[in-house]
């Protein structure tokens, strides 16, 4: 008499073919071995469900804000698939930064134009003459102020007192100048603003300065890693990742 054969617990045998010599098939999941030799766990794979659609065109930005999906296609912005405005600048890639204030807004920009949209879907162009004419990708909201960055390594800030990304203070300016390389991307890590340049990265924090920019450089924080391309910068679960120079 032969010894009894131990069958796997995680799946039933012969559920793919009639032969018991062929392993079972896991659909939309995967198995991993646990701490013990005979421990196995089955995990469901992440899945996607249809939510909304937008017209065909060049995708320029996508962002989830307050459980609503905002997408920019060509020169139009959609909220959960519904058109909010067709008057955007139809160029480049848009980046986003949620803002607070009396009326919370979503600030979004490409390299030449900036806009806000509120929860009601009202889109407003930033027309303040103090907003820089050209910027690099990325925008950051920190302690009531919205910041943008340009290729000359200037960090511009909105009116800190008003908590309004449509109003920009001409004195709210600081330069990432430890090294003389061009600005590539502005990002945020925890409570710090990262000025990513071609070959170096510099960090700033909100020092609450009464005059000029509220920001001050974090002493000793210079990193000898720049950014190859702004589109490689991603925040993954609080960890900032990018392709470095």
Residue ranges and their predicted role:
Residues 72, 106, 242-243:
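Short beta-strand/helix segments in adaptor/scaffold domains that form protein-protein interfaces
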Residues 208-245:
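Acidic, glycine-rich loop-and-beta core segments that form the ion-binding/anion-interacting portion
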Residues 67, 104, 192, 238-240:
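Short active-site oxyanion
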Residues 83-88, 124-130, 167-172, 213-220:
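Beta-propeller fold detector
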Residues 1-84, 136-204, 208-209:
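N-terminal beta-propeller domains
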Residues 55-63, 89-104, 130-143, 180-186, ...:
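Repeated scaffold domains used in trafficking and secretory/extracellular systems
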Residues 82-113, 118-127:
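Acidic, glycine/polar-enriched metal-coordinating patches/loops
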